[in-house]
Amino acid sequence: MTALLDALAVTLESRLACLDLAEHAGEMVALVGPNGCGKTSLLRALARVEGAGGEVFIDGEPIDRAPEARRRQLLAFLPASRDVPWPISVRDIIALGLSGRDHGRVERRIADFDLDDVRDRPIGSLSTGERSRVLLARAMVAEPRLLLLDEPLANLDPYWTLRTIELLRAAAAAGSAVIIALHDLAHVDAFDRLMLMRGGKVIADGTPGQLRDQLGALFGVEAGDGGWRLRR
């Protein structure tokens, strides 16, 4: 099977080792590791932020040479910060950069994330959890081939955590590839693959079942009947 994403020798200044990785359409991958291990740096390198090295291809197309409109079709990047500097409405944030022909997509994401009641409010007036839903809707609205999401489940209540996983799974089923940074081990089984990171390197890559013991060792915890617990 041809990979949707091919990343070759990606780096980000001194924070990320030289990495190669591939991902296929329909996959949901979680980057997991302790604070400072390189999850955000890897996402930023794949999103081609300033200072990123190496090459990234999506469906064989080099992302660095794609025009801005094409880049939006190929990938979306949700940074960890939920701050938005623009005093514009929720609907306008979601629709930013789209054409009038995309009205149906915008309305569908507003409905998916239950934002109709706040659609005309400035995004800065919303709670952190509401802003997270708005920015997730914005990331997903163009139905990009690759979704790169930094802690998308942070600040969400239990319902919206599970609903967001459901929406990401639907995006993957429709042909996108999804890579997220994840801290909460309670949700690792929702993902097809885990990439365990430490010191700017991927130290293991496999299914949640395959990496259960390594995951526990990485954090000093172990799986029990009631979930994860401290290793004694």
Regions found by a protein language model. Give the residues of each.
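H-loop (His-switch) and adjacent beta-strand-loop-beta switch element
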Residues: 194-206
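Conserved ABC ATPase "signature" region
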Residues: 104-119
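Helix-to-loop junction immediately C-terminal to a conserved catalytic motif
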Residues: 47
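ABC ATPase nucleotide-binding domains
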Residues: 213-232
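Catalytic Walker B motif of ABC-type/P-loop ATPase nucleotide-binding domains
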Residues: 147-151
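H-loop/switch region of ABC-family ATPase nucleotide-binding domains
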Residues: 181-183
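ABC ATPase NBD coupling module
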Residues: 62-76, 81, 86-87
